[in-house]
């Protein structure tokens, strides 16, 4: 009888521990979603100049007279098996104080030196935005690059996370020491955002991607740290295909 009672107590304790752990995981997942939702709820931002009038998270890192600068970034990275890793992307700095935007279009290729160490070879093309149009600030001989810049769209302009709550049972990671956190979800090719990416980029795989929400800093909000989203189609040694996006407000350098 005593053994039976001990067994019942042990099983009850085990169930309690599992329930508590699961509850904590679900709670942290909800916190991570809520942290990202503050920004992702603005998507799609079809007219980027609307960001001049959009408020973001502010803390004591901001001067009281500084409205802040939005930094928006989108990049597609492709490395077919056995080939070099190549990426194309753009970053803009949208100053809310002066309502001016500058940035750069970046074309990158990863090479390896004699010792096999990776080395990035980048080409940067300075740009500015006027009347919601992105234009080069210097002459560009390559007509293909010119067109890529003129036709470039950030993920924030066409992506949508109105149904962020539908993503469930994610792989959750949280490190309070850094602090850093992430939530990973397996998507399908029927997902709206996946369809949008396939429509705009030549993605050399039919595999459905995983969505990764990852960040650092206080979950409740911080101007220090980062919040990135990533769609990972392939992640192997010598073979990678992924898309990254970020949008965050930082103190302006002119203040």
Swiss-Prot record:
It is a lipid-anchor. Belongs to the staphylococcal tandem lipoprotein family. It is found in: Cell membrane. Coiled coil: none annotated. It comes from Staphylococcus aureus (strain N315). A lipid is attached at residue 24 (N-palmitoyl cysteine). This is Uncharacterized lipoprotein SA0096. Keywords: Cell membrane, Lipoprotein, Membrane, Palmitate, Signal.
């Amino acid at each position: 009888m005593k053994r039976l009672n001990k067994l019942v107590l042990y099983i009850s304790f085990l169930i309690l521990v599992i329930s508590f752990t699961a509850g904590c995981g679900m709670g942290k997942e909800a916190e991570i979603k809520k942290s990202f939702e503050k920004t992702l709820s603005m998507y799609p931002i079809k007219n980027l100049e609307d960001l001049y009038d959009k408020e973001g998270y502010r803390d004591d890192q901001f001067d009281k007279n500084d409205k802040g600068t939005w930094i928006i970034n989108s990049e597609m990275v492709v490395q077919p098996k056995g080939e070099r890793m190549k990426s194309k992307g753009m970053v803009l700095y949208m100053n809310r104080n002066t309502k001016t935007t500058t940035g750069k279009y970046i074309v990158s290729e990863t090479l390896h030196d004699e010792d096999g160490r990776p080395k990035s070879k980048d080409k940067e093309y300075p740009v500015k935005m006027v009347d919601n149009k992105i234009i080069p600030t210097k002459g560009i001989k390559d007509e293909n690059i010119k067109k890529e810049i003129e036709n470039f769209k950030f993920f924030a302009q066409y992506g949508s996370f109105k149904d962020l709550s539908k993503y469930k049972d994610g792989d959750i990671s949280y490190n309070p020491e850094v602090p850093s956190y992430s939530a990973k979800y397996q998507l399908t090719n029927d997902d709206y955002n996946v369809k949008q990416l396939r429509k705009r980029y030549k993605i050399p795989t039919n595999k459905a991607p995983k969505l990764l929400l990852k960040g650092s800093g206080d979950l409740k909000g911080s101007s220090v740290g980062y919040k990135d989203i990533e769609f990972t189609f392939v992640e192997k040694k010598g073979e990678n295909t992924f898309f990254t996006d970020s949008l965050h407000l930082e103190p302006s350098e002119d203040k």
